Structures are given as C-alpha cells and as structure tokens.
C-alpha cells in the first residue's frame, strides 16, 4: 500500500509540472497585473481638457501629456498605437471631434455629448481630475512667468537702446569735428599765401633801411675828412 501511494504521488507531481510548463509556454500569465492608470479614453479626455485649445489638441500633445502625467510605462511606441486606435474609435462614436487631419493624425477636441456632461457637472473621470488641477496650477504659474519675462526684456532693450543712440550721436559729432579740423589747415595755407607779398615788401624795406644806414656813414666820413682838410 505504501509503495502504491508513493507511485501515485510521484505521478501527480509530474502531471502538475507538465501543466505549469504548458501554461507558461502558451504565454498565459499566472496573474494579471493591475493597471496603474485609467482607461485611454479617460486619459485622452483629461489631456484635451488640460491643454484646452480652441482649435483642438494634436495627437503629439496628447501623447506627451499622457506620458508625463500617467504611469503608462516607458514603451512609448506601444502607448502611441493604443492611443491611435482609441482616437479612431472615439471619433467614430462621436465622443471626440476631429477638427483637422484624417484618421489618428490632426487635432482633436471634446465631442458635444462630453461637453454637455461637463456642463451639467457629471465627472468624466475621478482620479485624473485631481491631477489636472495641479497641472493647471503649474501651467498658470508658467504662463504668468512667461508674461512677466517680456516686460523685463523690453525694459532691458530700451535701456540698451539709449546708449546706442548716444554713441551714434557721438560718432556724428566726432565726424563733424574731424571735418572741421581738416578744413582748418586750408585756411592757414591761404593766410600764408596772403602774407607772402607782405614779407617780400618788408624785406625790401629792411634792405632800403640798410642802404640808408650804409650811405649815412659815408657822408659822415666825408664830412670828417672835409673838416680835417679845412683845419689843415
């Protein structure tokens, strides 16, 4: 009896091992992993509400928002394929309207039925809405910071613009001064030309004076000699 029971136990163990191997080889997981994110339809609606463009949100913007705010994993090509299929179904059903493009490409916005539900106050999703409030606050802070930046930049440009104008004025004044300095030597040269004949005449006057001085001693000497001769 004991030997037969041992054989039965070994046979049962072998059968269970074969069943478990077949189960794994066929690709059936032992337990399904719990999803850490809501459905793709809810995530798409949350992304469109957060982006809130009047003309619609592009698929790339929706995918970026989903990847940043939901735990969808790192396999973005797989997430993109799911997103495309859900967008096509939502456009066909009328939950989402396609403003531009065809198929899964283009821009999308909320459908009329979803907008009515939002106006009445029926929440489309529960968990992501809490995240959307935080995201909206961050977006508002970013938009405020972007609005304040242009004013500072404009002030800086104005402050920098004034010295440029003054430098231009200084450059013009320096050019004018240089032109005046260039004109000044010409005036001096003209003055020298005018003074030329005067110098010649003055030279003649000096020569005449010298001649008179030379002539005067001769007359004095003649007078002296004349007086001496008279005394003798």
From Swiss-Prot:
- Broad class of where this protein is predominantly found: nucleus
Gene Ontology BP annotations:
body morphogenesis; chromosome condensation; egg-laying behavior; locomotion; multicellular organism growth; negative regulation of DNA recombination; nematode pharynx development; nucleosome assembly
Tell me the keywords, alphabetical order: Chromosome, DNA-binding, Nucleus
Tell me where in or outside the cell this protein is found.
Nucleus; Chromosome
Q: Which CDD domains match?
A: H15
Tell me the segments the record calls region Disordered.
Answer: 142-232
* Keyword match Membrane: no
Which Cys-Cys disulfides exist here? none
Domain (H15) ranges:
36-112
Q: Which family does it belong to?
A: Belongs to the histone H1/H5 family.
What name goes with this protein? Histone H1.X
Q: Which organism is it from?
A: Caenorhabditis elegans
Q: Which gene encodes it?
A: hil-1
């Amino acid at each position: 009896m004991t030997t037969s029971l041992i054989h039965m136990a070994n046979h049962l163990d072998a059968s269970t091992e074969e069943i478990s191997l077949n189960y794994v080889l066929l690709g059936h997981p032992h337990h399904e992993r719990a999803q850490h994110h809501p459905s793709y339809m809810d995530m798409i609606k949350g992304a469109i509400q957060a982006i809130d463009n009047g003309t619609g949100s592009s698929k790339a913007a929706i995918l970026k928002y989903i990847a940043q705010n939901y735990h969808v994993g790192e396999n973005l090509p797989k997430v993109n394929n799911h997103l495309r299929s859900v967008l096509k179904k939502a456009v066909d059903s009328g939950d989402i309207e396609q403003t531009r493009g065809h198929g899964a490409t283009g821009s999308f916005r909320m459908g009329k039925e979803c907008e009515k539900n939002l106006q009445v106050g029926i929440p489309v999703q529960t968990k992501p809405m809490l995240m959307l409030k935080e995201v909206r606050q961050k977006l508002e802070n970013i938009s405020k910071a972007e609005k304040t930046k242009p004013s500072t930049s404009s002030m800086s440009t104005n402050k920098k613009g004034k010295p440029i104008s003054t430098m231009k004025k200084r450059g013009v004044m320096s050019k004018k001064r240089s032109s005046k300095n260039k004109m000044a030597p010409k005036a001096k040269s003209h003055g020298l030309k005018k003074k030329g004949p005067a110098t010649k005449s003055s030279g003649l006057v000096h020569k005449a004076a010298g001649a008179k001085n030379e002539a005067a001693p001769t007359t004095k000497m003649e007078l002296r000699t004349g007086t001496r001769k008279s005394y003798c």
